[in-house]
């Protein structure tokens, strides 16, 4: 009868939670209206410039004027937009696969990971209490975000590592990606111009003055970043050939050249083509906050015969003091018979220090006397005796050498040239235009941090730093001005699969540690504290000093001699020889008697046993080095990312004011930065009159027959257009701030004003809208159209107004249907996107093709948006790796629901409300709340 195959054990899905860490309680977007005035008011943080007399400095245009005053940075509040717990999403899928177990209780427990506040009242007492730690993904200018973290949330001196990957040059589109669907971005392609206000402001402000602006941009951010670093902290700045010399000089100025650690060169996946010589490498400049106290965890690679670090390992120990020189074939690694543990190099046993009174001037070894020459031996007479008895000495000519085995320290420290970090076609899939290889960031973080440490990345991109930090148990904060980048990063983290490494503070970790150390497992209580690290693979680090100081060698030697010496004397008597130990041959001669052969075999057996015992003692007494990139893994478990929040800067424009509430003109800024709001409005109206407002289809374009100023508080212009019946319609034009976000409250006030003035429709023009404004489509009879302005308009004074190009585009509202499935359960279906038809004044629905992803909070409490279900409609599948790992736990049918316009069924919530958030490929977000 055929044996029935045992079912594979199901994998446990777990996550790491940093219970010992905390973060300040900050407001969610929902709580903005109940914040105290002092929490809402802008804070300015001043950073002192470095004393220019301390060392040589790079000079660029405008720097002297900037140095006349401190660097002053606004520190606006941050708002939580979403709370994401990837394990909740996987648990929900597992329940779907098991068909129908209740999800409410466990989800409630998991979302408690975001709380940790002392009382219910503390929810609205912002910046006063500590909550449980959750990682953070923040949309906004890194300069202001870092200042806010330092000043408002007391993170000054708390960050262990910063990985900064600024734009390598000063070209706009080559550094920014316009859509989640394409990495193909070309300068000069109008279709590929990013429309994100945060990015274009950064570009316009930063690169207006070429390399001079670039250096100002870097110095400002490095100054604020330094303030966040712990005394033991490090910063890594990744940069290309074009500006590496300038960036190094700026970092010398900000951090002090005494805190420079290394300039690392690493090979890129592809070269930069030029007419001269191709560039195949980029650079990482590494500085410490304070070199005397910076944290360093050495990185190693295994030694390979014949390569750098092993060229002297050309000898092979055959045992019993016999050795041979390796052949070229053996050195190349082609010989399978070579035991690399017995390969050794002959190292110097002497030092250049002149001999002093008690130093050994001569040492007898195997019947010959050896002197250290003009120097001295590296150890004393007792140490030399231990080396001799340990089989660690070898004469070469008139010199006595130290036998250093490859296995004594089988790794070599990684230097500052990395040729093993390139992304290959079979490794990570690249999703973002300037995505850095994961192995580069991984190595940097592992050298400068421990599990539980905080890592910050001011240029998030596709979220590689966050992904690496999450994998290795580090806490993380990542910042980007690009909505597209954060959309990609969020999907990447939500669907990521990580190995489950054995925690040192766990029962399994204690057992593994005991195996490695040869001791009995500890009985101490365990708490799964990440800060205590993982259990790592380790390698011995046997040194000359440790062998020289090993007194146990004498004990083993003397004990073995009780057997060896009588056998040696007996062998000499049988063969009529006077052999000393080192003279006894390894092989027998044909003319020996049977008794002599037996004695010879017994002696060599005891001799080899003595050496094994001494080798074991040497290994046991030696230090070891952890391989921090090789923790032990529990294959029965799979890990998903821990809880994280998606946040953004204050939705209000932040202006710096003095004590008299007058606007402050920031030093070093040009006149165009301080132009009146009226100038900005006039530029927008001029372009609006020429370009009109475009929707998804050309036939839906609103073309103005006239556009005249209007003296309102919020409405600034009266626009006229005609519908299909040639009836003239009046549109009130509301223009949002040049750098800021329009909120729902802004639209409500503007719509009321439009109704009072008898307009037919309100057209709001803004660079960005908050997610809550998405519900505001109509106020009474007034239809509200939200047009997103093209980022080109930030630079409108430099652009020719041709009326061509979609400068004002409406992202239609998602059309959502709530389906009652019976038994107290409901489903949500995204039907498409609603588009306003100006020719008819009606709304038409298009399909969901423009939607990248959509999320549901199935029990919305009007305090926070929890992502309880997530769906990804694009071609990229963020759950690809998890699907492979969890085949047995979650069936294909359940996985398929993640790429769907219809949600999985869920219980009607006790709160009576659900919230649906929809994100398009440009990173725009809209959120709708429904009563169910």
Where are the language model's segments positioned?
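S-adenosyl-L-methionine-dependent nucleic acid methyltransferase catalytic domains
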Residues: 1-295, 305-310, 316, 365, ...
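N-terminal auxiliary segments of SAM/dcSAM-dependent transferases
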Residues: 301-409
């Amino acid at each position: 009868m055929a044996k029935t195959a045992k079912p594979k054990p199901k994998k446990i899905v777990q996550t790491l939670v940093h219970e010992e860490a905390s973060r300040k309680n900050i407001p969610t977007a929902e709580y903005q209206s109940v914040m105290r005035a002092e929490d809402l008011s802008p804070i300015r943080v001043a950073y002192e410039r470095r004393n220019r007399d301390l060392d040589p400095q790079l000079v660029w245009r405008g720097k002297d004027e900037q140095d006349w005053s401190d660097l002053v940075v606004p520190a606006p509040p941050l708002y939580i937009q979403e709370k994401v717990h990837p394990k909740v999403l996987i648990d929900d899928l597992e329940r779907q696969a098991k068909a129908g177990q209740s999800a409410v209780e466990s989800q409630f427990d998991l979302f408690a990971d975001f709380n940790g506040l002392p009382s219910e009242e503390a929810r609205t007492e912002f910046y006063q209490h500590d909550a449980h730690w959750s990682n953070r993904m923040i949309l906004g200018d890194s300069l202001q975000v870092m200042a806010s973290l330092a000043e408002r949330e007391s993170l000054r001196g708390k960050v262990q590592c910063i990985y900064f990957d600024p734009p390598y040059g000063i070209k706009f589109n080559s550094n920014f990606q316009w859509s989640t669907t394409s990495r193909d971005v070309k300068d000069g392609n109008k279709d590929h111009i990013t429309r994100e206000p945060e990015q274009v402001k950064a570009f316009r402000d930063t690169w207006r003055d070429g390399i001079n602006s670039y250096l100002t941009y870097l110095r400002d951010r490095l100054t604020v970043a330094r303030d966040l670093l712990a005394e033991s902290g490090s910063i890594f700045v990744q940069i290309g050939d074009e500006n590496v010399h300038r960036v190094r000089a700026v970092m010398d100025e900000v951090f002090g050249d005494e805190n420079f650690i290394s300039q690392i060169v690493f090979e890129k996946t592809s070269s930069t083509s030029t007419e001269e010589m191709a560039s195949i490498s980029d650079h990482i400049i590494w500085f410490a906050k304070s070199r005397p106290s910076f944290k360093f965890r050495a990185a190693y690679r295994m030694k390979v015969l014949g390569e750098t670090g092993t060229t002297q390992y050309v000898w092979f120990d055959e045992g019993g003091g016999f050795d041979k020189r390796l052949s070229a074939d053996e050195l190349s690694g082609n010989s399978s018979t070579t035991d690399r543990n017995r390969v050794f190099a002959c190292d110097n046993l002497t030092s250049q220090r002149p001999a002093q009174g008690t130093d050994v001037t001569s040492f007898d070894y195997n019947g010959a006397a050896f002197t250290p020459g003009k120097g001295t031996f590296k150890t004393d007479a007792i140490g030399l005796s231990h080396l001799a008895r340990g089989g660690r000495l070898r004469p070469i000519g008139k010199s006595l050498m130290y036998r250093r085995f490859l296995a004594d320290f089988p790794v070599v420290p990684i230097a500052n040239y990395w040729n093993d970090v390139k992304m290959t076609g079979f490794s990570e899939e690249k999703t973002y235009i300037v995505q850095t290889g994961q192995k580069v960031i991984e190595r940097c973080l592992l050298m400068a941090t421990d599990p539980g440490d905080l890592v910050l990345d001011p240029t998030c991109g596709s979220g590689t730093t966050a992904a690496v930090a999450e994998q290795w148990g580090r806490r993380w904060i990542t910042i980007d001005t690009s909505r597209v980048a954060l959309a990609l990063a969020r999907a990447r983290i939500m669907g990521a699969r990580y190995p489950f490494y054995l925690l040192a503070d766990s029962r399994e970790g204690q057992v593994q540690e005991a195996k490695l150390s040869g001791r009995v497992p500890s009985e101490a209580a365990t708490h799964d504290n990440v800060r205590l690290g993982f259990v790592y693979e380790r390698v011995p680090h046997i040194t000359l000093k440790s062998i020289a100081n090993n007194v146990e060698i004498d004990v083993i030697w003397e004990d073995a001699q009780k057997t060896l010496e009588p056998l040696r004397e007996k062998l000499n008597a049988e063969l009529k020889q006077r052999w000393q130990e080192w003279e006894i041959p390894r092989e027998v001669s044909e003319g020996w008697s049977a008794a002599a052969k037996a004695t010879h075999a017994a002696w060599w057996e005891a001799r080899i046993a003595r050496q094994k015992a001494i080798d074991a003692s040497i290994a046991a007494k030696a230090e070891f080095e952890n391989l921090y990139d090789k923790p032990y893994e529990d294959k029965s478990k799979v890990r998903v990312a821990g809880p994280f929040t998606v946040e953004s800067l204050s939705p209000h424009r932040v202006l710096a004011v003095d004590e008299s509430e007058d606007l402050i003109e920031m030093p070093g800024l040009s006149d165009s930065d301080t132009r009146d709001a009226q100038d900005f409005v006039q530029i927008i109206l001029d372009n609006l009159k020429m370009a009109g407002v475009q929707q998804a289809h050309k036939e839906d374009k609103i073309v103005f027959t006239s556009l005249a100023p209007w003296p309102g508080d919020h409405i600034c212009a009266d626009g006229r257009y005609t519908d299909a019946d040639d009836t003239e319609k009046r549109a009130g034009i509301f223009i949002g701030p040049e750098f800021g976000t329009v909120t729902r409250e802004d639209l409500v006030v503007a719509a009321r004003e439009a109704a009072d003035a008898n307009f037919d429709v309100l057209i709001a023009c803004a660079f960005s809208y908050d997610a809550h404004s998405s519900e505001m489509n109509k106020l009474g009879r007034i239809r509200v159209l939200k047009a997103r302005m093209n980022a080109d308009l930030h630079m409108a004074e430099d652009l020719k107004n041709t009326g061509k190009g979609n400068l004002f585009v409406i992202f239609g509202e998602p059309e959502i249907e709530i389906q009652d499935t019976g038994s107290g359960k409901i489903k949500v279906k995204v039907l498409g996107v609603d588009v306003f038809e100006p020719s008819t004044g009606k709304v038409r629905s298009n399909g969901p093709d423009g939607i990248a992803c959509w999320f549901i909070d199935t029990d919305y409490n009007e305090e926070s948006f929890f992502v309880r279900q997530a769906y990804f409609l694009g071609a990229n599948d963020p759950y690809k790796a998890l699907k492979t790992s969890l085949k047995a736990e979650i069936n294909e049918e359940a996985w398929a629901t993640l790429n769907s316009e219809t949600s999985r069924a869920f219980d009607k919530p006790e709160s009576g409300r659900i919230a649906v958030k929809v994100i398009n490929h440009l990173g725009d977000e809209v959120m709708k709340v429904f009563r169910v």
